Amino acid sequence: MATPEASGSGRNGQGSDPAVTYYRLEEVAKRNTAEETWMVIHGRVYDITRFLSEHPGGEEVLLEQAGADATESFEDVGHSPDAREMLKQYYIGDVHPNDLKPKDGDKDPSKNNSCQSSWAYWIVPIVGAILIGFLYRHFWADSKSS
């Protein structure tokens, strides 16, 4: 277990909840072996060492994600409500607030490319339609004059 100083625990004033133990991502990254396996799912830290041999998908799957944020992989598999409930028994703390990734709502709007991509999405078909219209008119006019 990490010391409060190493983990950035809420007990020393660095986290927002004094009842929760906070772990830095560097601390979690060190726990990536079969002897000590931690992972992060939705900002929460789990010590799944005891669960490795019981995992239905095999321990290799878990070891690939060990010491890292496994949220995307966990959700991609589509775990059952029972599996999500079982996960609670391996909970040991939260990722330190300074290490959490910003949520989608926290992104800088000036870096949002959705407007640019929507223009590209519409401009190509419009230019194509205009070009086809000119070509059609040109050839239709030529066939009428012949």
Curated annotation (Swiss-Prot):
Heme binds at residues 55, 79. InterPro entries: Cyt_B5-like_heme/steroid-bd, Cyt_B5-like_heme/steroid_sf, Cyt_B5_heme-BS, Cytochrome_b5. It is found in: Mitochondrion outer membrane. The chain crosses the membrane at residues 119-136. The modification Phosphoserine is found at residue 80. Residues 1-11 form a propeptide. GO terms for cellular component: intracellular membrane-bounded organelle; mitochondrial outer membrane; nitric-oxide synthase complex. The modification N6-acetyllysine is found at residue 30. Gene3D superfamilies: Cytochrome b5-like heme/steroid binding domain. It comes from the Eukaryota. PROSITE patterns: CYTOCHROME_B5_1, CYTOCHROME_B5_2. Component of a complex composed of cytochrome b5, NADH-cytochrome b5 reductase (CYB5R3) and MTARC2. Cytochrome b5 is a membrane-bound hemoprotein functioning as an electron carrier for several membrane-bound oxygenases. This is Cytochrome b5 type B. It comes from Rattus norvegicus. The lineage of its organism: Eukaryota, Metazoa, Chordata, Craniata, Vertebrata.
